């Protein structure tokens, strides 16, 4: 839409969550002139990047009375994209040579990502906006504004009114557990990757890992360091897939999907192979869930599609007072959070206008129809994949901010190609030095780094 003709408006906005999305949302809202309060349940900023050795009391996270742990980070986790493309556009995620405790690798550990987010919060004085150890209990629309009930870790309740709510609570807390015929009578151990931390508990076991992308690829190889055998069940594989991989201890196999589990401990794959397993690890993703949010029926979640959202951000009937930052998964997440946040901030200040409710609903219906036409299931509505660059550039144009850099887009493309073709080595061996050079020269030209690019290159 064209820039709005209305006078600039300052809103009182609450941001739910102080992870990467919440932090950059708070910054962009504040830059736009809004007053901002961030509500965060943890004791520090960082969201899902805060590692905890604790796991939930229910390893599958199905028991509604379980003790909930919000981190899904495992001890050995490293990023699956180069650090240059991960950072916010004006605060590069580059090595900190002034601190020997920091991880300077191009694909660093989860601890380095958390440290980067803490650096970002300090640089822009974001922590002064954050109320820590606050759980959001309920959010609902009231007379054109939003009422937010929350409580402290000590049980003290708060009831406040805001002009707008920006939901940045993430979507890595409610695990999705794949259905396996016969699993109820299967006698072995079961755990979702949300509760996986270290491989030790699987020593000398035969383990089946369901899922072979990102966490599945990582965790299967982590467990294979100590397990007797690890068998990966991959939905992306052909039905007759059966391949032995020589790493890390010549004890890792890739299969097609699981067909059935039996009470004698056996797992039968669709390729006909039978494995007697001790444990199953589900690396099968997560569900969107917003238990605190009351929208009077305007929104719902259907097969993991959050309905209805204009461009994955604004629910037409409740916009612009309610918005979501960070729903789409995969790709350049931090930059997506930043661009979406700029859009939300500009819309709330009336510097940019949204289409009418009817026009937004028409756009959503057309989007759903396009997914149906090519056979994409509802559960993949928020997986942008190859169209993420097009999506981000559209949002950037809406709010008048720069488009995503060429080098950043290409690092994503080539990074994922390496991940698929060389899952064992892609983090430490790469073939895109040209893109890394382009990135650091870009940082230097914009005066975003204090060292010469040759120090890295």
Curated annotation (Swiss-Prot):
Residues reported in the UniProt entry to bind FAD: 17-22
GO molecular function: 3-methylthiopropyl glucosinolate S-oxygenase activity; 4-methylthiopropyl glucosinolate S-oxygenase activity; 5-methylthiopropyl glucosinolate S-oxygenase activity; 7-methylthiopropyl glucosinolate S-oxygenase activity; 8-methylthiopropyl glucosinolate S-oxygenase activity; flavin adenine dinucleotide binding; N,N-dimethylaniline monooxygenase activity; NADP binding
The organism's place on the tree of life at top rank: Eukaryota
Gene3D superfamilies, alphabetized: FAD/NAD(P)-binding domain (3.50.50.60)
UniProt record, GO biological process: glucosinolate biosynthetic process
Catalytic reactions on record: a (Z)-omega-(methylsulfanyl)-N-sulfo-alkylhydroximate S-glucoside + NADPH + O2 + H(+) = a (Z)-omega-(methylsulfinyl)-alkyl-glucosinolate + NADP(+) + H2O
UniProt xrefs under InterPro entries: FAD/NAD-bd_sf (IPR036188), Flavin_mOase (IPR000960), Flavin_mOase-like (IPR020946), FMO-like (IPR050346)
SUPFAM superfamilies: FAD/NAD(P)-binding domain
Keywords for the protein's UniProt record, in alphabetical order: FAD, Flavoprotein, Monooxygenase, NADP, Oxidoreductase
Function: Catalyzes the conversion of methylthioalkyl glucosinolates of any chain length into methylsulfinylalkyl glucosinolates.
Protein known as: Flavin-containing monooxygenase FMO GS-OX2
Species lineage: Eukaryota, Viridiplantae, Streptophyta, Embryophyta, Tracheophyta
